[in-house]
């Protein structure tokens, strides 16, 4: 990632990397919030809700900030939305975001050995499916 692509905000006690690509589509982007001055307890990968047809990671900056204040790294991922795509694309995007996080988060100061999935509403469904149904992660090893 180039310096121009990396935005760090240190005055608030955390670093923020915006719009990191986790896949080929324009909405395959995530923001990474990392606590400053200490290693994170774990990396929390969060998927927001919005009935799979609305939402953006920027609306959940408050969550990224709150998690870093508590010693966690937060990864908040955008994913493709309806009507541009239909189910199961939402869960497939979540699986891709998790696979990227597992493979790459150490380079961003995170814990690939301690990833916690979290979500709200439709995003909670995405997180739950990754946790209980192995078919979503199977294509990613």
Regions found by a protein language model. Give the residues of each.
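N-terminal cap/lid segment of alpha/beta-hydrolase-fold proteins
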Residues: 1-38
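Short beta-strand element of the alpha/beta-hydrolase
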Residues: 40-50
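Loop/turn elements at helix/coil->beta-strand transitions in domains of secreted/extracellular proteins
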Residues: 41-42, 72, 113-114
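Short beta-to-alpha linker loops that shape the active-site pocket of alpha/beta-hydrolase fold enzymes
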Residues: 50, 73, 78-82
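Short N-terminal helix/helix-N-cap motif within the alpha/beta-hydrolase-1
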Residues: 54-61, 84-85
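Short amphipathic alpha-helix adjacent to the substrate-entry channel of hydrolases
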Residues: 58-76
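Helix-loop module immediately N-terminal to the HCX5R catalytic loop
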Residues: 91
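Primarily recognizes the serine-hydrolase "nucleophile elbow" in alpha/beta-hydrolase
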Residues: 96-141
């Amino acid at each position: 990632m180039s310096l121009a692509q990396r935005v760090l905000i240190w005055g608030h006690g955390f670093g923020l990397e915006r719009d990191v690509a986790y896949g080929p589509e324009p909405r395959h982007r995530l923001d990474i919030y990392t606590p400053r001055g200490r290693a994170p307890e774990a990396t929390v990968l969060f998927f927001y809700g919005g009935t799979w047809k609305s939402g953006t990671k920027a609306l959940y900056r408050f969550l990224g900030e709150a998690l870093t204040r508590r010693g966690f790294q937060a990864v908040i991922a955008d994913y493709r939305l309806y009507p541009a795509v239909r189910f199961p694309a939402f869960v497939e995007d979540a699986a891709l975001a998790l696979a990227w996080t597992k493979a790459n988060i150490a380079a961003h100061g995170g814990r690939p050995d301690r990833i916690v999935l979290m979500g709200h509403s439709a995003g909670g469904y995405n997180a739950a499916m990754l946790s209980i149904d192995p078919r979503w992660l199977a294509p990613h090893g």
